[in-house]
């Protein structure tokens, strides 16, 4: 009788590459990077569609007769805007005659501002000030700053006030023979006797704790006063020095100008200029004292609830050709920590007219229709990869990818996978030994890395017959991994603390530090991914070897008494008893199908960060899926012996 020996043999040729892992190695026909680099999309987006609000003008106003051709946003996004054609936050604050006066108010964790162009040099607003750009700059900056600390904000368009009896509402020729609604101008008649200058003005206004349904913890108030070049300009009638001062309830000066103690400008002009400072005041009763003749009375404010920190995006607001714009919005946002600025690269070219419906702006604002994982000055990202080719400029919020070179991202095996015995050679070298246990990996692997370091490795369990190490020994190995990575992070933190010593209040130094921190985090994450890659390879290798043993067990069961297993994966069979069809039944039942495989691995990576920290990523958590489907094809080598 002729007996033959039949063995399972893993088939590997030159097309396979070897991948070393902790606990086992793999041959694979292909390989791929654990993550691909993502590229941010230019423009604005939001982290959560349910928690944002916008403030705009005709370019976001659905009631505009030319909508949607006049709009720079989609109809869906326009629903989010509080807008009115011709309006702006500053116009509603000051209320110059003949301009749109809109009640801006709303709530949202993320506030987007696309307005401001309606108060620009083209508007030609005078009222004792031919150029309002610096006041607009300070106003917009204050709005962005307070909006970033509040959930809700609202214009308060009527403050309670008490006006002295001797004054009446005044007008000005250079203000369309009217005057601003805020501050209101009150005058005191001193004629016919010019030497009688009238009385000092004393008025009161109250900043409310609530306006309608809006809570007010802090108000933005315009403290306006006249600036005279010399005492003689104001003192033509012998009325002393000019002053206009605001006091709080305790008598403390909070704003204004007092030429009784402060010098005049010394210039040669004979017409005063109005200056307005932006004050942040708590609710309460305030008094205004002014010299005779003129009283500028605060009658409006913007109120903020100051309940939570939030995000602010400011969109450049400029005219098309033929109209003069300013760049106060840009400068205000750039000088406000945490404000993200959206800027055009080309002139504004409208579709509905020269000033409405710009295609570039539509593209920049199209991201407002979506939810992003990360928003930054460099753009927005909604892909799940933790890496991007270029450093994302701050401010940035959400789960922002870190800068990395493509070649530094570890590769994992893919395609046809063949397990081999043994472990990574580096594990056997004492100097580079990372783990205390060689047989480390078992089952489904999920890694959670938190801000303080490794939070824990959570293990799924395989069926008892699957083999492998005990849960207790694996957990000890994972604890060692956690300690080693924690040491890596501690070293990084020590380096960061040293860098902190050279930081004062220099903005560029802070940005440089932020970049160094992100680079350190990127390197640390890449190092951790390298370890995870090795764990994955070992885990798959062990799982596939178990699959081969399961196949061998199935063959033994099918053979019964017809074949004798002489060594793992090898059988002796008598071909006089079991002919070719019999052998095919035993050994080739799975000839064209894959060997049973381990469940797909669902290892995930997700960069967690404080959503309101301008420096971005504060912690790392492994949460973006990498699914690896393993496939093994068995070959049968037949050795004939007499």
UniProtKB/Swiss-Prot annotation:
One of its GO terms (molecular function) is sialate 9-O-acetylesterase activity. Residues 353-638 are annotated as: Fusion domain-2. The active site is at residues 58, 353, 356. Its main location: virion. Residues 138-297 are annotated as: N-acetyl-9-O-acetylneuraminic acid binding. The keyword Hydrolase applies. GO terms for cellular component: host cell plasma membrane; membrane; viral envelope; virion membrane. Residues 2-27 are annotated as: Fusion domain-1. Its EC number is 3.1.1.53. It is a single-pass type I membrane protein. Residues 298-352 are annotated as: Esterase domain-2. It is found in: Virion membrane; Host cell membrane. Residues 28-138 are annotated as: Esterase domain-1. Keywords: Disulfide bond, Fusion of virus membrane with host endosomal membrane, Fusion of virus membrane with host membrane, Glycoprotein, Hemagglutinin, Host cell membrane, Host membrane, Host-virus interaction, Hydrolase, Membrane, Signal, Transmembrane, Transmembrane helix, Viral attachment to host cell, Viral envelope protein, Viral penetration into host cytoplasm, Virion, Virus entry into host cell. Residues 2-617 are extracellular. Glycans are attached at residues 13, 48, 131, 382. One of its GO terms (biological process) is fusion of virus membrane with host endosome membrane. It is an enzyme of class 3 (hydrolase). Disulfide bonds join 7-570, 107-152, 127-175, 197-239, 216-303, 224-276, 333-339. Binds to the N-acetyl-9-O-acetylneuraminic acid residues on the cell surface, bringing about the attachment of the virus particle to the cell. Plays a major role in the determination of host range restriction and virulence. Class I viral fusion protein. Responsible for penetration of the virus into the cell cytoplasm by mediating the fusion of the membrane of the endocytosed virus particle with the endosomal membrane. Low pH in endosomes induce an irreversible conformational change in HEF2, releasing the fusion hydrophobic peptide. Several trimers are required to form a competent fusion pore. Belongs to the influenza type C/coronaviruses hemagglutinin-esterase family. Homotrimer of disulfide-linked HEF1-HEF2. This is Hemagglutinin-esterase-fusion glycoprotein.
């Amino acid at each position: 009788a002729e007996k033959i020996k039949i063995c399972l043999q893993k088939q590997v040729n030159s097309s396979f590459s070897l991948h070393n892992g902790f606990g086992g190695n793999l041959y694979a026909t292909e390989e791929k990077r654990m993550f691909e680099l993502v590229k941010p999309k230019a423009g604005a987006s939001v982290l959560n569609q349910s928690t944002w609000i916008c403030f705009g003008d005709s370019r976001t106003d659905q009631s505009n007769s030319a909508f949607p051709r006049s709009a720079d946003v989609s109809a869906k996004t326009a629903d989010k805007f509080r807008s009115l054609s011709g309006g702006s936050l500053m116009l509603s604050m000051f209320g110059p005659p003949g301009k749109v006066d809109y009640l801006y108010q709303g709530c949202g964790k993320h506030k987007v501002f696309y307005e401001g162009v309606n108060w620009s040099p083209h508007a030609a607003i005078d009222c004792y000030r031919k150029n309002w750009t610096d006041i607009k700059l300070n106003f917009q900056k204050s709005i962005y700053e307070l909006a970033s600390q509040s959930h809700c904000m609202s214009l308060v368009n009527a403050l309670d006030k008490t006006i002295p009896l001797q004054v009446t509402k005044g007008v000005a020729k250079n203000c369309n023979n009217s005057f601003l609604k805020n501050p209101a101008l009150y005058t005191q008649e001193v004629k016919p006797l010019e030497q009688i200058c009238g009385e000092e003005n004393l008025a009161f206004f109250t900043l409310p704790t609530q306006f309608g349904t809006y809570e007010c913890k802090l108000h933005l108030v315009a403290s306006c006063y006249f600036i005279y070049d010399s005492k003689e300009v104001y003192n033509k009638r012998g009325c002393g020095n000019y002053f206009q001062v605001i006091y709080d309830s305790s008598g403390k000066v909070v704003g204004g100008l007092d030429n009784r103690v402060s010098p005049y400008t010394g210039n040669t002009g004979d017409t005063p200029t109005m200056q307005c400072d932006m004050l942040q005041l708590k609710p309460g009763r305030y008094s205004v004292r002014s010299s005779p003749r003129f009283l500028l009375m605060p009658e409006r404010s913007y109120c903020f609830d100051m309940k939570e920190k939030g995000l602010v995006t400011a969109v450049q607001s400029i005219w098309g050709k033929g109209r003069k714009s300013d760049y106060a919005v840009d400068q205000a946002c750039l000088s406000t920590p945490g404000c993200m600025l959206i800027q055009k690269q080309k002139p504004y070219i409208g579709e509905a007219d020269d000033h409405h419906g710009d295609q570039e702006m539509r593209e920049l604002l199209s991201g407002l229709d979506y939810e992003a994982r990360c928003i930054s000055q460099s753009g927005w990202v909604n892909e799940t990869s933790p890496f991007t080719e270029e450093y994302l400029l701050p401010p940035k919020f959400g789960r922002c990818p870190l800068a990395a070179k493509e070649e530094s991202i570890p590769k994992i095996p893919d395609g046809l996978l063949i397990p081999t015995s043994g472990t990574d050679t580096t594990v056997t070298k004492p100097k580079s030994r990372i783990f205390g246990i060689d047989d480390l990996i078992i089952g489904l692997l999920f890694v959670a890395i938190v801000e303080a370091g490794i939070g824990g490795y959570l293990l799924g369990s395989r069926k008892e017959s699957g083999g492998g190490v005990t849960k207790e020994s694996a957990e000890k190995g994972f604890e060692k991994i956690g300690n080693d990575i924690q040491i890596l992070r501690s070293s990084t933190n020590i380096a960061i603390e040293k860098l902190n010593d050279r930081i004062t209040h220099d903005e560029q130094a802070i940005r440089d530090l932020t970049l160094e921190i992100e680079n350190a985090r990127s390197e640390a994450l890449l190092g951790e991914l390298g370890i995870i890659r090795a764990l994955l390879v070992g885990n798959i290798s062990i799982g596939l070897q178990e699959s081969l043993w399961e196949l061998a067990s199935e063959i033994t069961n099918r053979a019964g008494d017809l074949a004798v297993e002489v060594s793992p994966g090898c059988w002796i069979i008598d071909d006089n008893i079991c002919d070719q069809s019999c052998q095919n039944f035993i050994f080739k039942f799975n000839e064209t199908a894959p060997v049973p495989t381990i469940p797909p691995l669902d290892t995930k990576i997700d960069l967690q960060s404080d959503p309101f920290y301008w420096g971005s990523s504060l912690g790392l958590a492994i949460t973006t899926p990498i699914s690896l489907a393993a496939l093994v094809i068995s070959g049968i080598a037949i050795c004939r012996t007499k």
